[in-house]
Amino acid sequence: MVAPSGAMSDSENSSSSSSDAEELARCREAATPAWGLEQRPGAAERPEAGAADKQAPTPQPSRRHEVNQHEEDGNDLRTTPEFRAHVAKKLGALLDSSIAIAEVWKKSQKAKMQQVAKEEDGFRLFFTSIPGGHKKEASPRPCRKRQPPSSSEDSDEELQRCREAAVSASDILQESAIHCPAKAEEKKKLKKKAKKKVDNADLAAAPGLEQVKEAGVVNGDPVSLGIQKKRKKKAKKSREAPLCPPAECAAAKPEN
């Protein structure tokens, strides 16, 4: 539906024109000090000595389109009052919802600001120190006291430790090079083995000596005979040495 457009009365036209004129005058008064278009009212009331003949400049007409002077009325959309009421109700509901959301956001922001203010109480000793860190530190766990061991267990452990740490004199003598009978016996055994090897070699060479002797007798060479005698003496000594141990030989010498 379209609302009927009626002509405004003369009294309304006059009141609107007077209010518009007052607004224009106020705007001009506010704009003249900045732009220098007109003089201030105080300056116009107090003219200088040489400016009596000068007149104030005439105000320029406004170029704005005045609503009251055009052909149509103020309702350009030509809406009905019912439609305007419906739109107003919708806008009111929208504004109420936005205001409620804004209040909730403000409450959350206030709570955050209060929390930050509580955390920032005091001062930071270092740049990396966390505010409120001393509150979050967990209390240390209580140390459990060990029960004192019984006397029998303690004595057994001490004896075992002493046995592990103790070293006998025989172990020290065995490891030392001076008092080591086992090593001396090993050396004697090695010497005996070396002598036996030499004796065996001499016995193996005995048939060869006999052949050389026979050859020397046949040839009648005195040098070969002397060599043969020396070899025989060495062979006899090597045979007598293993048969007679050194202790028995020493005991037999004074008897001879």
Swiss-Prot record:
Record's compositionally biased regions (Low complexity): 1-19, 246-256
Chain location of the short sequence motif Nucleolar localization signal (NLS) per the record: 228-235
UniProt entry tagged with the keyword DNA damage: no
List of residues that carry Phosphothreonine: T80
Subcellular location: Nucleus envelope
One Pfam family named in its UniProt record: CUSTOS
Cellular component, GO annotation: nuclear envelope
GO biological process: Wnt signaling pathway
Residues annotated as transmembrane: none
Stretches with biased composition (Basic and acidic residues): 63-83
Positions of region (Disordered): 1-83, 127-163, 227-256
Residue positions, PTM Phosphoserine: S62, S139
Keywords: Developmental protein, Nucleus, Phosphoprotein, Wnt signaling pathway
Record flagged with keyword Ribosomal protein: no
Residue spans of biased composition, Basic residues class: 228-237
Family according to the record: Belongs to the CUSTOS family.
Alphabetized PANTHER family for the sequence: CHROMOSOME 12 ORF 43 HOMOLOG, PROTEIN CUSTOS
Function noted in UniProt: Plays a role in the regulation of Wnt signaling pathway during early development.
Protein name per its UniProtKB record: Protein CUSTOS
Species this chain originates from: Mus musculus
Upper lineage: Eukaryota, Metazoa, Chordata, Craniata, Vertebrata
Gene: Custos
